[in-house]
Amino acid sequence: MNFILFQMPYQSKKRKIKTFKLYAILLFVCMGCSKDNNTDANCNFLVNLNVSTSLNLNLSQYNQLTFPNNPVYVPNEGNGGIIVNNTGTGYVAFDAADPNHIFSDCSVLSINGLEAVCGCSDANEYSLITGQVLENTALRCMLKPYFVENNGNTLYISN
């Protein structure tokens, strides 16, 4: 009988520890789930189109990508084409449609040095290194990035 009485408090203590761990895990999960996760309904102007293309850097239209900070526009991919840039430490690719507009002819971005500029009246400007907004800090959406894999003289761009 003493043996059973001795085990009961020990099992109860184990159960309390397990319960505490369960509540701690649930607390961390609930704290990690938040409605404010830096997404904004206005950032849903661009459609999630399937992007899967490759660029041969030996071709003349893409050869300038072998040198840092010479962005290239690739038409007929993504929402408004794709802008690819060699940052010096790697390659980045962004959708060439302004993410702060409903897609239209004027919202296709043009390259101006290391900036992408919207053709609409507000002329939003974005960095072609980070994709961040440059001028109007009230804008919530950065450029839509794509995954770039460098394999020799070929870049594979996808989402």
Predicted regions and their residues:
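The N-terminal extracellular segments of secreted preproproteins, especially immediately downstream
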Residues: 5, 29-32, 42, 105, ...
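Bacterial Sec-dependent N-terminal signal peptides
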Residues: 9-15, 19-55
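N-terminal pre-ligand scaffold of iron-sulfur
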Residues: 36-113, 124-128, 144-159
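Short cysteine/histidine-rich metal-coordination sites, predominantly Zn2+-binding motifs
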Residues: 112-122, 133-146
